[in-house]
């Protein structure tokens, strides 16, 4: 049995995937897991691999979906992306991290797609820190 929180999250991910497809993204994988790491949606647009985090909240919630993309969460996303790139042997591909915020109001929802949702340099501590090993 799926609890209400998981059902809400699944509905948000379904809506986000549909939005991405409508805007020309090709879905490669959903809910990709490696150990304790997970990527909600992996897709591509043009030559770029896009790792998409989906955050779903009820409209009456006290926090916005963007508040859930903490520094720690960004690090986990980067680790998961590294694992996927290694598994797919796709280190030569351009990559970015997007965020799709889903706010549910009853049976309807509002979606916001944030491209390049966070700065890798800031997340990885500044300087010339490359997250891809080349």
Swiss-Prot record:
Gene Ontology MF terms in the entry: nucleic acid binding
InterPro entries: Restrct_endonuc-II-like, tRNA_endonuc-like_dom_sf, UPF0102_YraN-like
Pfam annotation, one family: UPF0102
Family assignment from sequence similarity: Belongs to the UPF0102 family.
Name used for this protein in its record: UPF0102 protein DVU_0833
Species per Swiss-Prot/TrEMBL record: Nitratidesulfovibrio vulgaris (strain ATCC 29579 / DSM 644 / CCUG 34227 / NCIMB 8303 / VKM B-1760 / Hildenborough) (Desulfovibrio vulgaris)
């Amino acid at each position: 049995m799926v609890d209400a929180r998981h059902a809400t999250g699944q509905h948000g991910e379904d809506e986000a995937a549909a939005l991405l497809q409508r805007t020309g993204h090709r879905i490669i994988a959903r809910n990709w897991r490696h150990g304790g790491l997970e990527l909600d949606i992996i897709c591509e647009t043009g030559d770029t691999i896009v790792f998409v985090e989906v955050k779903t909240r009820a409209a009456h919630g006290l926090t916005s979906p963007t508040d859930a993309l903490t520094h720690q969460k960004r690090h986990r996303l980067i680790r998961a992306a590294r694992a996927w790139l290694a598994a797919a042997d796709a280190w030569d591909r351009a990559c970015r991290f997007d965020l799709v915020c889903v706010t549910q109001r009853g049976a309807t929802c509002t979606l916001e797609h944030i491209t390049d949702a966070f700065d890798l340099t800031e997340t990885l501590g500044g300087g010339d820190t490359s997250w891809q090993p080349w």
